[in-house]
């Protein structure tokens, strides 16, 4: 059994965080070695509320929760949380997603085990990719499952698109060694973006370009497992540093 640590980044949105964790608890079917949450709100009130809430949501896991005393930005928070990981795989998660189908980690392993240059597998629906194009050719992988012993996974590779190789901080499985190949993320980002950028897309693009230069790519399943629920409650990214 390949060990997986969940790393979840949050920023004070406890209502969305609760929905995210509850849906993960309901639909995840793979054993989790550790569950790490790092909150970057810098808000003591949020920290006090989370201290009361999270032990119940995470009672089934060996869990660790960290609060930044003042905001550091998502990227520094990710680098810190990843530095605490001692498992070969990370399931990255943010605080504004809702899962609705099972076996997303097992199915991701089926693809990643067969392709060492697959940086991650997207779990969104095909019509929910922010217009990121995919290859027309589809691929099939059979897998055993109790309810579907002859089931087939259909997926597509994502095309390189305006510098994007497919890397994203959206929910998804990734190898710890692939992170360590370029770690920390902050060294690949312009200084103006490291603390608290106005657009996280710029950060993802810079990291995606780096992985693309190393030959990595991403894939997406024909059927999705998760939806974004945070559009109307986006974190206001203003530095307090």
Segments the model singles out, each with a brief description of its role:
Residues 3-5, 34:
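Cell-envelope/extracellular polymer assembly enzymes that use nucleotide-activated donors
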Residues 13-27:
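Short, well-formed alpha-helical segments that are part of the catalytic scaffolds
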Residues 69-84:
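Glycine-rich, basic loop-to-helix element that forms the pyrophosphate-binding segment
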């Amino acid at each position: 059994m390949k060990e997986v640590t969940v790393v979840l980044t949050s920023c004070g949105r406890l209502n969305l965080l609760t929905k995210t964790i509850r849906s993960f608890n309901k639909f995840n079917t793979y054993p989790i070695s550790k569950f790490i949450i790092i909150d970057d709100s810098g808000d003591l009130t949020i920290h006090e509320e989370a201290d009361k809430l999270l032990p119940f949501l995470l009672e089934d896991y060996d869990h660790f929760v960290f609060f930044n005393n003042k905001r550091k930005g998502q990227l520094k928070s990710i680098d810190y949380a990843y530095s605490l990981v001692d498992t070969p795989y990370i399931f990255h998660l943010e605080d504004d997603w809702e899962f609705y189908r099972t076996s997303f980690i097992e199915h991701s392993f089926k693809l990643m085990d067969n392709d060492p240059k697959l940086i991650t597998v997207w779990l969104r629906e095909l019509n929910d990719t922010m217009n990121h194009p995919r290859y027309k050719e589809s691929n099939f992988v059979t897998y055993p499952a109790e309810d579907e012993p002859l089931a087939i996974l259909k997926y597509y590779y994502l095309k390189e698109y305006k510098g994007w190789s497919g890397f994203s901080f959206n929910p998804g499985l990734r190898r710890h060694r692939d992170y360590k190949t370029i770690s920390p993320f902050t060294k690949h980002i312009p200084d103006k973006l490291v603390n608290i950028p106005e657009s996280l897309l710029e950060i993802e693009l810079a990291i995606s370009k780096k992985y693309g230069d190393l030959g990595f790519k991403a894939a997406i399943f024909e059927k999705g497992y998760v939806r974004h629920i945070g559009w109307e409650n986006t974190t206001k990214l203003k530095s307090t540093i």
